[in-house]
């Protein structure tokens, strides 16, 4: 079945005249801010070289830390760090980047540190972070977190 397909230059010319807003301006309060990170491979061997000669020991990775509005799926802020920076170390920087009011912040157990909870309390944000496995109780000022410890 022969199908015609426009080439890149034709698509590029036509795209100039399309008036679609790519970013919707959002304002106001963020109900739930979801925070997580992922690893990115910056550079490495090509597939052929790895298959032919084997893998080298050193790899170059970076970590992308993201904060996303759960309601609109908009990326509120992002931070790129070296692979040796932990999620909890990058967390305060992500929270400080946003200047909008946040009601609650969700994150995984890796963010269950006093540094993260202190930053959320400073900005009056409710923490929705599960305690780590075999977590102990913290001082009384972390009462909300202590209620989740089983």
Locations of regions flagged by a protein language model:
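Active-site- or DNA-interface-adjacent structural scaffold in DNA-acting proteins
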Residues: 1-56, 68-72, 121-129
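A general structural motif
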Residues: 30, 63, 100-102, 124
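A short secondary-structure junction signal
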Residues: 44-47, 76-80, 89-93, 116-118, ...
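Short, flexible loop/turn motifs enriched in small residues
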Residues: 57-63
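Active-site beta-loop-alpha junctions of metal-dependent nucleic acid enzymes
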Residues: 58, 78-100, 104
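A short, conserved beta-strand element enriched in hydrophobic/aromatic residues
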Residues: 65-83
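Short, conserved beta-strand edge motifs with alternating hydrophobic and charged residues
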Residues: 67, 78-79, 104-108, 128-131
């Amino acid at each position: 079945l022969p199908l015609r397909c426009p080439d890149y230059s034709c698509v590029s010319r036509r795209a100039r005249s399309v008036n679609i807003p790519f970013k919707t301006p959002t304002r106001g309060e963020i109900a739930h801010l979801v925070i997580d990170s992922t690893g990115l491979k910056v550079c490495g061997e090509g597939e052929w070289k790895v298959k032919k000669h084997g893998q080298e020991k050193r790899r170059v990775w970076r970590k992308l830390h993201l904060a996303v509005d759960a309601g609109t799926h908009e990326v509120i802020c992002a931070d790129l760090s070296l692979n040796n920076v932990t999620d909890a170390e990058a967390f305060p920087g992500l929270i400080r980047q946003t200047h909008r009011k946040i009601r609650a912040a969700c994150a995984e157990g890796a963010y269950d540190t006093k540094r993260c909870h202190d930053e959320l309390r400073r900005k009056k944000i409710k923490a929705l972070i599960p305690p780590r496995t075999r977590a102990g109780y913290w001082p009384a000022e972390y009462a909300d977190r202590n209620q989740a410890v089983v």
